Amino acid sequence: QRQMCIRDSWWQEGSRECIDYGHKDAFQWITMIRLPDFVKKGDFEWAVKEASAKKKMDFSKVEFFTYEEGICVQCMHTGSYDSEMETIQKMKKYASDQGYEPDYSHRFHHEIYLSDPRRTAVEKLRTVIRNPVRKINDRR
């Protein structure tokens, strides 16, 4: 049985037009796991209660939410997390060539980790990188 992939959304406080990937230490993030569509909020709340009781851990910050990601540019990155900038630059150029620009006004850099870094060689790590975009000159 395949488990759902871990996802992170990253942002930097005060960065509305771009993100400084050279300063990942300033990133803030939320880690997510996509749930199957049949899981409803009541199911989630029951599971959190059960896990809290059985694991004796604090799950108070775990939450159930949905969101619309909007228009994005996305690419598969293979290799070290530290070499993602090269892929991100290619994505930015592709978006620009298509008439789009980055849009971090209310959306985030998003990574979907397809590989387990504990079991996968660094050069074989696979990460989907997704960045929000908007049409150039569409500054809502």
Residue ranges and their predicted role:
Residues 44-83:
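A mid-sequence, solvent-exposed acidic-amphipathic segment
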Residues 48-53, 83-103:
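Long, well-ordered alpha-helical scaffolding segments within enzyme catalytic domains
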Residues 14-17, 61-63, 108-115:
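Glycine-rich beta-strand-turn "strand-cap" elements at beta-sheet edges
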Residues 33, 128-135:
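A short, hydrophobic, proline-anchored segment that marks a local hinge/packing element in signaling
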Residues 9-16, 22-39:
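Extracellular-facing segments of soluble proteins and assemblies that are Gly/Ser/Thr-biased and enriched
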Residues 105-125:
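Beta-rich nucleic-acid/ligand-interaction surfaces
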Residues 22-24, 63-68, 123:
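Short glycine/proline-enriched loop/turn "hinge" motifs that connect secondary-structure elements
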Residues 2-6:
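Short, small-residue-biased leader/transition segments that mark boundaries at the very start
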